[in-house]
Amino acid sequence: MKKTLLTSLFVITVALCSAAEPYFRATWVSTVANIDFPSKAAIGNYEQQKADMIAMLDEFQKMNLNAIVYQVRPTADALYPSELEPWSHWLTGKQGEAATYDPLEFVCTEAHKRGIDVHVWINPYRVTLPAMNIEDLAPNHMYHKHPEW
């Protein structure tokens, strides 16, 4: 009986002293229609985009967030170098036009400096938005590659 009680007490003590998993304190960073990033004023201005992202991450760090959910595929286009999808016009101003930096790599590097994890968010079904002009879609956009869809 005494041995069982001591064993139970030991197990309970170890369980209570174990480090708890940190809470997931995150925010979404939406890129479609330039809701959060990049600002409309920074489209095509990559140094301004970097400065804006650093300011956002600094603010998230002050808010004690430990993760962001970063939208990297808003309208069948990409905010990272991709062989499958064109560059996003929300980033460059013209769909298919390459940025001079890798925004996803930049976000990951800067977020990790602040102890913030990055989770990517893709929209697998959204091809365009009503306000988008079909003629402005890049030749390698899904709309042109798979019209049967």
Short names for language-model regions:
Residues 43-63, 90-114:
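Aromatic- and glycine-enriched glycan-recognition loops and surfaces
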Residues 71-79, 106-143:
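Substrate-binding cleft and catalytic face of glycoside hydrolase catalytic domains
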Residues 4-14:
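Sec-dependent N-terminal signal peptides
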Residues 19-66, 70:
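Mature N-terminal, pre-catalytic/accessory segment of carbohydrate-active enzymes
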Residues 9, 32, 73:
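Flexible loop residues that form catalytic
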Residues 30, 34-51, 125-149:
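Active-site-adjacent "subsite" loops/lids of carbohydrate-active enzymes
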Residues 63-99:
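Aromatic-lined carbohydrate-binding/catalytic grooves of carbohydrate-active enzymes
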